[in-house]
Structure formats: structure tokens, C-alpha cells
Amino acid sequence: MYFVIVLFGLFSNTAYGQITVTQFNAGWNSANDVPWIMGLKDCKSLGYSDIAKNSEEATKYKIAVVPTIIIFKDGEEAVRFQADLSFKMVATKEEVQEAIDELLRSDF
């Protein structure tokens, strides 16, 4: 039984260790922050980057509109969700979670 638990632990860390999610926004657009991002599941980490304070991040990830949510798999961009012209995120929590789940399923 102990072996099964250890094996499951190793397997789950491998699967979950690949996905990170970052929200890119700017302080002047804080009214349109995406609060539900911290409730996403099966991610190694969830982050926030204020591109008004860290313009290098905006350049590095080619952020054209805020907020933008990027899902990274193994350190590489896998999926991007961007706000509409009114600077509001159009993607839902369910859509972002489904993208995460699909990336995890693609490993099997």
C-alpha cells in the first residue's frame, strides 16, 4: 500500500509540475483584475505581473492588452487568453481551467 501511495505522489507531482499560469495586468487597470485566477486547479504556480512596473515582462511575453492570462507548460507558452477592447477578460474560469485540463490530458 505504501508503494502505491508513493508512486501516486511521484506521478501527480510530475503531471502538476508542468503547468504555471500568470495574469499580466497593469495597476491602472486593477478594476479588471481576474480574481478567480487564484482558484484554478492542477497548477504548479499561479502568478501576477504588473506590466506598468515591469515593462520587461510586457516585452518578453508580447503583452498587447491587459489583462492577459498565459498558461505555460514546461516553461513555454501553451495558451493565451486576452481581454477585449474594454480591457475586460472575456474568458471564463471554466474556459481557462478546461485549457489547463486539456494540457494535462495531452501528456497521457
Question: Where would I find each of the regions flagged by the language model?
Answer:
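Local sequence-structure signature of Cys/Sec-based thiol-disulfide redox active-site neighborhoods
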Residues: A15-G47
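Short, glycine/charged-enriched secondary-structure capping and boundary segments
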Residues: P35-M38, I63, D84-L85
